[in-house]
Amino acid sequence: MKKLKLHGFNNLTKSLSFCIYDICYAKTAEERDGYIAYIDELYNANRLTEILTETCSIIGANILNIARQDYEPQGASVTILVSEEPVDPKLIDQTEHPGPLPETVVAHLDKSHICVHTYPESHPEGGLCTFRADIEVSTCGVISPLKALNYLIHQLESDIVTIDYRVRGFTRDINGMKHFIDHEINSIQNFMSDDIKSLYDMVDVNVYQENIFHTKMLLKEFDLKHYMFHTRPEELTAEERKVITDLLWKEMREIYYGRNIPAV
């Protein structure tokens, strides 16, 4: 896409939001409580602040304020307000390719924010535990928050990821012509590195005329030992392993497709 000569500030708002899910099987109530405590500590407010601070570094944002909170009995949230940073638009790379992991990218941002909220949960029956983190990176300016996508997916290793990217508003060029997007994008997947693509099955649902892009990701490899909390698969019978595997796969598919799957 040809570089635009704008009249004034770039008023486009670019929002990247995604949910990441981590699934676990905990056999007993004690194990379920242990998993929730473990994941709650792993993604506490301090760690999330470190991740979001590095995200700001990747997209070149100046941090104005950080609000963070751990919650009882579990969960955490962090919100960072960021400000614009002067930049020569000619230096901004708008091409459709994976972002850094991490690498400094200068951005031009205003009225922008980055936030994350976590939601650990479990059910007393069935042994399933899930951890969900909601992340949003919203910027106004010449750079897309998609540049931070690679870093965030690597930092929050997940079984399932759902990603939404939307460009809102418009900006004017020097001739007064309105532009409703200022960079090329066919798929969010084009902003992911090859190592991420090799790990997940992915599907897109895009509404190009509305500048709305959606990608869902489901981990390809399934190894039961990675989903057991304080229990080794070899300690279980073959029948128990099959029941747990079927239970986990059903849970993951329901989250991935966003609907309940009837038992067969």
Swiss-Prot record:
Keyword rRNA-binding attributed: no
Catalytic activity, as annotated: S-adenosyl-L-methionine + H(+) = S-adenosyl 3-(methylsulfanyl)propylamine + CO2
Location of Pyruvic acid (Ser) modifications: S112
Recorded coiled-coil stretches: none
Required co-factors: pyruvate
Keywords associated with the record: Autocatalytic cleavage, Decarboxylase, Lyase, Polyamine biosynthesis, Pyruvate, S-adenosyl-L-methionine, Schiff base, Spermidine biosynthesis, Zymogen
Residue numbers annotated as active site: S112 (schiff-base intermediate with substrate), H117 (proton acceptor), C140 (proton donor)
Domain of life the protein comes from: Bacteria
EC number: 4.1.1.50
Signal peptide: none
Annotated pathway: Amine and polyamine biosynthesis; S-adenosylmethioninamine biosynthesis; S-adenosylmethioninamine from S-adenosyl-L-methionine: step 1/1
Role played: Catalyzes the decarboxylation of S-adenosylmethionine to S-adenosylmethioninamine (dcAdoMet), the propylamine donor required for the synthesis of the polyamines spermine and spermidine from the diamine putrescine.
Family: Belongs to the prokaryotic AdoMetDC family. Type 2 subfamily.
UniProt protein name: S-adenosylmethionine decarboxylase proenzyme
Lineage of producing organism: Bacteria, Pseudomonadati, Pseudomonadota, Gammaproteobacteria, Enterobacterales
